[in-house]
């Protein structure tokens, strides 16, 4: 069973979202996603300053098995990308919740409430 931390929010497309004290969002891929992908070998992340729409493909994660898009969970502006993860993509496999991919300043903080909680995400992956 995949690790699904209770304090995070989730999307049906397997991104996790941590709401930071300043209201910004830290985003990565879930443990379930990295298990399904296998060994991650490449990441392409959005640049700071890029405006994203909810559901927009904004990054790519490639493994030895497949390449998958990563989607913006809400509308907002990219404020940082994790160069350490780009330099060592295998870090996503080692700890999917420590190896964040990018940070987003949400256009509307209320949009985060509509994302899945841990229980909702667990139900989503159980039915997949």
UniProtKB/Swiss-Prot annotation:
Keyword Transferase appears in the UniProt entry: no
SUPFAM superfamilies from the UniProt entry: Single hybrid motif
Family matches, as InterPro entries: 2-oxoA_DH_lipoyl-BS, Biotin_lipoyl, GCV_H, GCV_H/Fam206, GCV_H_sub, Single_hybrid_motif
Keywords: Lipoyl
Co-factor requirement: (R)-lipoate
Pfam family, one: GCV_H
Gene3D superfamilies (alphabetical): 2.40.50.100
Job of this protein: The glycine cleavage system catalyzes the degradation of glycine. The H protein shuttles the methylamine group of glycine from the P protein to the T protein.
Annotated protein name in UniProt: Glycine cleavage system H protein
């Amino acid at each position: 069973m995949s690790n699904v931390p209770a304090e995070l929010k989730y999307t049906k497309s397997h991104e996790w979202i941590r709401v930071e004290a300043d209201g910004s969002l830290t985003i990565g891929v879930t443990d379930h996603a990295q298990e399904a992908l296998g060994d991650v070998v490449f990441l392409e992340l959005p640049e700071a300053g890029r405006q994203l729409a909810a559901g927009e493909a904004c990054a790519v994660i490639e493994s030895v098995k497949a390449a998958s898009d990563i989607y913006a969970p809400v509308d907002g502006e990219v404020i940082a990308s994790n160069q350490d993860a780009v330099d060592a993509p295998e870090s996503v496999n080692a700890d999917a919740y420590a190896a964040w991919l990018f940070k987003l300043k949400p256009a509307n903080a209320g949009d985060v409430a509509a994302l899945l909680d841990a229980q909702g995400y667990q139900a989503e992956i159980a039915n997949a």
